[in-house]
Amino acid sequence: MRRGMTRWRLVIHGGAGSERIAHDDPAHEAQARAGLEEALAAGAAILERGESAIDAVETAARLLEENPCFNAGRGSVLTEQGEVELDAAIMDGRTRAAGAVSGIKTTRAPISLARRLMEHGPHVFLAGAAADRFAATSGLEQVANDFFILPERRRQLDEALAAGSAADPIKYGTIGAVAVDADGNVAAATSTGGITAKRWGRVGDSPLIGAGTYADNRAAAISATGSGEYFIRAVAAHEVAARIRLGCETLQQAIDGVLADIASLGGKGGLIAVSPSGDAAWGFTTPAMYRGMADASGRTVAIYSEETER
C-alpha cells in the first residue's frame, strides 16, 4: 500500500503472521480491529493537535501493549520457561535519539520505559533486571510477571513444547507505530513479547535500532514485524532508510526490496514506514498483517492481504 502526501500521518501494525490469526476466531478479529482503531484514534488526536510524532507513536504503542489481542505487553507469548520477557524500542527521527530495552519482566509499559531511557538514561540500550530497576527508579509502574500471562498463551506454550522442532513460531506478534507530525518530524516505536517457547534471553529484531526500529528525518521512520532473526541479519529498518537516502527508490519500493531480500534468506514478515513529506507505505510477505493508518482524511484498519485500504 502507498498513499500520497498529507500534513501528518500515523501508521500502526499489530504483527504479521499466518491467515489463521483471525479467520479461526471471529471474536478475536473484532477485538483486534477495535484495538487498532483505539490506538489510531489516540495517536491521531495527538497529531491533530499539532503535537509531536514521538508522543503519537508512544501513545499508540502503549495502547496496543495493553490490548491482550496482540503479542506485546499484557498477553505476550511465553518463553520456554513459562515467563514473559518483553522487548521494545523507540526512536526520534529529528535527533536520532533512541531508547531500547529487552528481557523486561516487571515493567508494565515497555515502550514508555524505552522512551524514558532515551530521554533520561545514560545509555541507549538496557537489558533484563537492570532495565526493570531503571524503570522502577524512574517511577514507571511495576507488576508481577503473571500480570502479562493469559491462559491462552500457556496453552500455546504447551503445544509448542509438545511439537518440538516442528512448531511454527511465526503466528503473529509484535506491535509498532510510525508517524510524521505537522513539523515533518518522524518517529518509530516497536514492542513485542517475541516468539512462543523462545530460549531464555533471546532477543529479536524489535529492540535493535536499525533492525526492527529506525527513524531518521533524512529518510523515514520504520517498524518491523516477523521472523526477527532474519530481520536482524538484513538490518531491515535501516536498510529501508538507506535506500531512501540514496534517492533511487520510493518508500514502497524500498520496503518491497527489503522484504524480498529477507525472503531470499528464508524469513517472512512485514514493514511499515512514513517519510518526513507525509508519504506512507507498508508491505508483508505473510498472508495477513494487523495494520492501520490515520491522517487528516480519516482512519482505516485491515488484516488480510486481500483487503483494500482506502
Question: What spans do the regions from the language model cover?
Answer:
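Alpha/propeptide regions of enzymes that mature by internal proteolysis
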Residues: 2-310
